[in-house]
């Protein structure tokens, strides 16, 4: 058990260190280091516990200024480069940090990092999120940001250090006007999870859960397809306030954590297999005169 008196963690209340020690976003990197965001009013540190049991700490700066992060969310490791870490700041100084640790996570002196709290979408509209509740990266390396009023994406082609460009997905009204509305623009987005087919499961605070897919047309545009929308009325969701979503990658089972309990749904997308060492075929053997179904598992 790691506490302020026996670790590198700091308490929000120095006079009574065992009273309140806040940690967020714990995760292990590929080197076996445990990353912890140790936060509070006057504590803005990243703490790292090495495999050798040593605690290291450093602050994050952006353009020479130390960035306070009193209420950070999870740390999302970039799929393109594990040295890149995305850290959303949920409330109080709301924004998004990209940290590049240069492969030396216990040495903050050679890092580069940037904090942004303002973006402009494809139509030139300014976005300054009041709250950021969720962050995810899909298989195309697009960053999805869920806020208190809708969501936006940062395409993989955008250099976060050089540009504050983003995109907001548009749902066409199909009423002959060629007009559309931003996807879930009035919803609080509590969570975003990407499944094995690169579809997005989105949990909202008041409208249940959505499963959407992005289909690229011949002109390079993006069409948003709503595959499913689960609510209390049409499913077994115990509440329309979906706080968290998790997927069992090997089976595709989707778990919904709501304000009134937990429920799961068996979806049809699993993560691709790295090899074919665990193939399951039934029936086996298959004889030439067999006319029934053939089941093969382990290809994806």
Which residues are covered by each model-predicted region?
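Surface-exposed loop and turn segments in beta-propeller and other repeat-based domains
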Residues: 1-19, 56-68, 106-128, 160-185, ...
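Short loop/turn segments immediately following the C-termini of beta-strands
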Residues: 31, 39-41, 46, 80, ...
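Glycine-centered coil/turn sites that cap beta-strands in beta-rich domains
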Residues: 275-300
């Amino acid at each position: 058990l790691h506490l302020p008196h026996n670790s590198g963690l700091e308490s929000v209340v120095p006079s009574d260190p065992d009273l309140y020690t806040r940690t967020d976003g714990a995760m292990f990197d590929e080197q076996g280091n445990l990353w912890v965001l140790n936060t509070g009013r006057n504590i803005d540190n990243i703490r790292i516990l090495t495999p050798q049991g040593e605690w290291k700490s450093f602050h994050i700066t952006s353009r020479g200024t130390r960035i306070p992060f009193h209420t950070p969310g999870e740390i999302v490791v970039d799929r393109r480069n594990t040295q890149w870490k995305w850290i959303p700041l949920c409330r109080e100084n709301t924004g998004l940090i990209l940290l590049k640790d240069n492969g030396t996570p216990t040495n903050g002196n050679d890092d580069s990092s940037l904090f942004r709290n303002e973006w402009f979408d494809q139509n030139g509209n300014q976005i300054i999120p009041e709250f950021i509740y969720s962050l995810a990266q899909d298989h195309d390396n697009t960053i999805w940001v869920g806020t208190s009023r809708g969501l936006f994406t940062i395409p993989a082609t955008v250099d976060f250090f050089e540009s504050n460009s983003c995109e907001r997905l548009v749902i066409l009204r199909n009423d002959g006007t060629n007009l559309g509305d931003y996807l879930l623009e009035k919803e609080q987005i509590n969570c975003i999870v990407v499944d094995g087919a690169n579809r997005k499961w989105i949990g909202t605070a008041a409208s249940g859960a959505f499963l959407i897919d992005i289909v690229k047309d011949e002109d390079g545009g993006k069409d948003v397809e709503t595959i499913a929308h689960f609510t209390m009325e049409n499913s077994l969701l115990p509440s329309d306030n979906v706080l968290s979503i998790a997927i069992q990658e090997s089976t595709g089972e989707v778990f919904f954590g709501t304000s009134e309990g937990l429920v799961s749904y068996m979806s049809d997308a699993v993560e691709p297999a790295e090899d074919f060492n665990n193939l399951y075929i039934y029936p086996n053997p298959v004889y030439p005169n067999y006319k029934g179904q053939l089941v093969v598992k382990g290809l994806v």
